Amino acid sequence: MPFCFPSSLRPCPAVLALVALVGCTAFESQVEEFPDAGPNGPDSTYAGIGQGIPFGEFGLTTEQFGAPYTGAIVQVSRSSVASVLRAGQGRRLRLVLNLAGGGKHYVNPDGTFNLGLWKARIDTYRDVDFSPYVTEGLVLAHFLMDEPGAARRWGGRPPTRAEIEEMARYSKSIWPALPTAIRTTAEWLGRGDTTYANLDIAWAQWAGPHHGAGTGLTPERFRDENVARAKELELGLIFGMNYLDGGDGSSGIPGTELHPEWWQMSAAEVAHVGTVLAAAPYACALLSWRHHAPFESRPEIRAALDSVVRVAAVRGGTSCTRRGTVPAP
């Protein structure tokens, strides 16, 4: 039987009066666009709920949901989130949802981070109850922000670690059961004296041995150092690879337009690094930057990615939340 409002909505008396006059018809389409979460709790057909961990990428469209991918990082809007949830549920992909969108939406005129604007973007989803989708396994986490430590992205003044924890607290005040993730390493998060009571997940992306968090490291040391630091902070850990700028030069193929002096990863690098990261027992997902059809359509790259997919699929699932209790809002 259709109903007018999701259980998370508390309509005001004026709205109730309007419904009494015109009935539910005008509201049904908005309500019915959201899929029903599985009625029996966690669904073991999702990677990480049963066997394996999610394997996926930034930049996938809903039309690309499905094998070989079992996870995706998706930038959504209030008008698109329902259709993304439907698509993910239909293809059994676990979704990390970027609710606020790109950084351009929450910066000051000088390019510095504006926490108030970020919160305003999050407020547009207050009528959406994500908790059933978290329980089912469809929604893996709320992606708070990309690369907070990259000063160039934030007008020369990166968001503070205290601001990141406040972002996580604000998310939890609306959706206590929704895990919070930030795409930066636990090592960066651990600098300073911020305590993370609401942030759940750190994110370590291999960008090669010449720059980024992997500078001077082997993939094995990168894995071990990030796992150790995440454990110290009691954070879950997502790993990823930078396919297009994370090579050591052995591919001979220049990186993206932003970094033509860097290198794409070779097939051998993808297979080796991906296997090292996907097999790490502490890692709860392998979600990489980014989907690029010309890169992935090369036979040797496709074969390398498929070998990593198999590793991610057969290992035991791992939770992304590492604390014993969910912090109070």
Which functions belong to the PLM regions below?
Residues 24-27:
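N-terminal Sec signal peptide cleavage junction
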Residues 33-329:
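Glycan-processing catalytic domains of CAZymes
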Residues 5-7, 29, 36:
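Generic detector of N-terminal low-structure segments
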Residues 1-14:
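Bacterial N-terminal signal peptides that target proteins for export
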